[in-house]
Amino acid sequence: MLNILNNVSNSSLYSAASNATAQTGSNLINDLVPETLTASGISIAISVFSVIGTIVIALSVLPQTIKTLREKDTASLSLLLFLLNGIATAFLTLYGIGLVTVHPNSFSFLVDIKNGMFIYNREEWVAGYLICGIFLIMGEALCSVTSFIVLFCKVNNMIKAKKMGMSEEEYYEKQIKPFLKVKGAN
């Protein structure tokens, strides 16, 4: 244990920082970020796949949300699908917040960005937690909000139809469709 502490205190990390102004950017990164902290190829691949998956999930409900807001037709939509999708993506948003905030370097990352300081984008926590977490927060929050918008429209139409003693489809045909100014709705 004492040997490890001596190696840390005598590491070239601290001496490299004092000579940082005289070095090129590439050498500076190699000296300041030890090889043990750099992201592995598998970490980067996992991050890329999770970001792609997050973007696809985030955009999956958007077309239906736009169509529902334009046409107000919710009769053929599944209430349970949008409820479960909204809840699941809300929890994934919380998971993204956890990924970003759980690592001790997260606070220093935010402070360094605010102060315009150099960010070590090759570190494991950036590839494994930060990038994935930021995309999860943005993407899944979008998906959750759009799912709950469609769910709200569906429940609203169901309640109004029930008050009038109609099915949701009849309510749409008699109360909503005649007043829509959407091309193809009438």
From Swiss-Prot:
Transmembrane domains' residue ranges: 42-62, 80-100, 131-151
Membrane topology: Multi-pass membrane protein
Protein's cellular compartments: Cell membrane
Keywords for the protein's UniProt record, in alphabetical order: Cell membrane, Membrane, Transmembrane, Transmembrane helix
GO cellular-component term (any): plasma membrane
Family: To U.parvum UU008, UU041 and UU042.
Protein name: Uncharacterized protein UU007
Organism expressing this protein natively: Ureaplasma parvum serovar 3 (strain ATCC 700970)
